[in-house]
Design a protein with these regions (language model features):
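N-terminal helical cap/lid subdomain that shapes the substrate entry/recognition surface
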Residues: 2-97, 105
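Conserved phosphate-coupling serine/threonine residues in phosphotransfer and NTP-handling enzymes
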Residues: 12, 113-115
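Low-complexity, intrinsically disordered short peptide segments enriched in small/polar/basic residues
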Residues: 17, 108-109, 173, 212
């Protein structure tokens, strides 16, 4: 039996790509009109702390004071999400069934996300996913965020397990880097916005192409 299976949220359990991209578009139109980064550049920030991503993007677009501008952009971004969150997200098909099966087998499950607790919990509650998780770590809970391992280490601490006994499952390179840094086994899912080649370069321990394969992970990675 696995000691702990930890999941990223956005792009792994819940499809939030449209919400995130539209939030960025609205925010840049308000603060840096005509300078919206490419979809590829925006997707590359997925999985990171939003404040850090906005600072980096603002600097790349020539902002004279990226720190101050990013703070203003953050307010606009979150205002948009509050208004449109529930209508622009959906669960990935098969995710609820996979979580239910793992939970029924007695595996302990957790969520580790760079998302603020309010929005993260709302997304899980909308699709009745929260009941499967024994532990959750949100942006608000730590001072350093993925790809730093702190959020994953905090989840292991709360669960009372050694990090090496845990698996971290995510859709981004930042997830894989964070998991490896935390000495956890890592799994990349292929139904998110990242290309397979990009994820392969991060060297996860396993890759899965459909949620049904998640149920096989404890056996596949020989976790006891």
């Amino acid at each position: 039996m696995s000691d702990l299976l930890l999941f990223d949220l956005d792009g792994t359990l819940v499809d939030t790509t449209d919400l995130i991209l539209q939030s960025f578009a609205w925010t840049f139109d308000a603060h840096l009109p005509g300078r919206l980064p490419s979809r590829r550049d925006l997707v590359a920030t997925f999985g990171r702390s939003l404040p850090a991503a906005l600072r980096e993007l603002a600097a790349e677009q020539g902002a004279t004071d990226p720190e101050a501008l990013a703070a203003e952009m953050l307010v606009t971004y979150r205002d948009f999400q509050r208004q449109h969150h529930d209508t622009l997200i959906q669960p990935f098909p098969g995710i609820a069934d996979a979580l239910a099966a793992l939970h029924a087998e007695g595996h302990r499950l957790g969520v580790v996300t760079s998302k603020m607790q309010h929005f993260a919990r709302r997304g899980m509650q909308l699709f009745d996913l929260e009941r499967y998780f024994d532990v959750a770590v949100f942006h608000d809970d730590v001072t350093r965020h993925k790809p730093h391992p702190e959020p994953l280490l905090e989840a292991a601490r709360r669960a009372g397990v050694e990090p090496s006994s845990a698996i971290y499952i995510g859709d981004s390179t930042h997830d894989i880097v964070a998991g490896r840094a935390a000495a956890m086994r890592t799994v990349a899912v292929l139904w998110g916005p990242f290309d397979r080649e990009v994820l392969e370069a991060a060297r996860p321990d396993a890759m899965v192409s459909s949620p049904s394969e998640l149920v096989e992970l404890p056996t596949r990675l020989q976790v006891r």
